[in-house]
Amino acid sequence: MNKKQKKMLKRIIVASILFIMIKVAKLPEYIEIPLFLVAYLEIGYDILLKAFKGISNRQVFDENFLMAVATVGAIGLKSFDEATAVMLFYQIGEWFQSYAVGKSRKNITELMDIRPDYANVEDEDGNLEQVDPDEVEIGTIIVVKPGEKVAIDGIVVEGSSTLNTAALTGESLPREVSENDKVISGCINMTGLLKIKTTKEFGESTVSKILDLVENASSKKSRSEAFISRFARIYTPVVCYSALALFLLPPVFNLIISNPADFGTWLYRALTFLVISCPCALVISIPLSFFAGIGGASNQGVLVKGSNYLEALASCKYVVFDKTGTMTQGVFEVAGIHHATIPEEKLLEYAAMAESYSTHPISKSLLKAYGNTIDKSRIENVEEISGHGVKAVIDGVQVLAGNDKLMKMYNIPYQECHSVGTIVHMAIDGKYAGHIVISDMLKPHAKEAIEALKKAGIKQTVMLTGDVKSVADKVASELHIDKVYSELLPQDKVNKVEELLSLKQPKENLAFVGDGINDAPVLSRADIGIAMGALGSDAAIEAADIVLMDDDPLKISKAIKIAKKCIHIVYENIYFAIGIKLVCLILGAIGIANMWLAIFADVGVMIIAVLNAIRALNVKNL
């Protein structure tokens, strides 16, 4: 609890004790009335001040005005206990609402804790100086001790350590880093001392982008929130005028037909009507439900840019994936060596050496599979043949490594390969020596992710890729994806998403999931753009509506389940609050409901709705 909540709780306790003592003591009226007024002012003075300020600023119709009119009117009718009770229970409801917001804000606050307070910079004498991260320029060497946060994105130039990325990803799995590895701000250094050369200013670093995203999330309202805001602006004046009509019209009608006017009875009913009609339960609980949903999601590494996107995700029926980096790891690995005429280890060594001067991902995968240091003194006359492969002399032997076009260029008969992937054919001194199959590996939970989406109510899954048909079909088959479109250029992907959008029903939404690097146009075009694996990707954070901070595709279904739970709670609160209020308004108008039932219809319903809204935080086991 913050200071304001503690102060309000003390006021509630003092007023409650005083109220109970007065009710139990059965004091004379001349003592009881002043004590009730003391209790009333102790608990309600701020509401009266807000109502007065609202009238002064010509912003009359709000819940403070309703409470002030209802309770002052009750005092005028000498219902001092009811006036005090209405104000007391209203403040209890407000305290619950404040506490609930604080509880849901806690997850956001924990995320805000990723913001570093300082960066360690060495001065000319080699001493460490703590400076504001905003003052650190690009290219500065910062020092991160064990237990400290990485202040700014950069590259490790000295040291090795383990980083805790839990605040960013929602996962506790640590990440090992050493020299030349990229690191991002917001991670916590767990073990060794690191020296990092900054590659960005603090304002452009990952942690700043994320904090900006979360801080602005509440400004993008859902349709439900926008409706409730419009509803409250119209509803509050309507019920005020209705209460005035309830107070004036029946007595006037009674006078016309020569019956007693009974103004006191109808004033009491009108005041009861006002208390019942207070729209707090809706106005408070619906934004709180979305706020709690966004807070719970952020705690799981799912960053939602606004409640409108959370609402849209709940109606998602189609999920379209990019392949590379989304459903596959985007890291090529040697999957097999076939038809080798020399030992496989030797063939792999020749391939790695021939490709050692290239920066192509295929070359990197061969070097990784070989695993040893390349002795470049053994390599001569390296020639890269564009679109074909590489020719080199290794230990005095001519080596060819490339595709079938390279083999045809040198008239070397080769073996066809039926495996799916990139095929690197090898020839030694003009004779075919076998081929190496290199494949992009599926992500560990990719298949489970598709199954989870089906269970979450997704009607169709689609994969778009620029890869060849054979590779795309194999991946789609392994993952049980419903449709696959291959050999697409970036613009083709946008066109295909537009085509899919035209086929869906108006109330259904389509989400596109990409790695956020080359997918910005498609992420923007879909109803909901989801970027995954966005740790360190500025493009993803900018282009997407929802950002998954790690590479686990299972988070997609989790995000959908969070959205559905949040919307379910919103509608529960709408139906419950409106239903109870309508019944109580009718009972109040015909004189059956008294002020105590009005208190339940207002404060009781608000507390129940607020407690229900807090459930949107509990998303860990979804």
Task: Mark where each language-model region is.
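Flexible metal-binding regulatory segments at protein termini and peripheral loops
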Residues: 1-31, 101, 110, 124-130, ...
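Juxtamembrane helix-loop transition segments at the membrane interface in multi-pass membrane proteins
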Residues: 52-60, 99-109, 288-307, 614-622
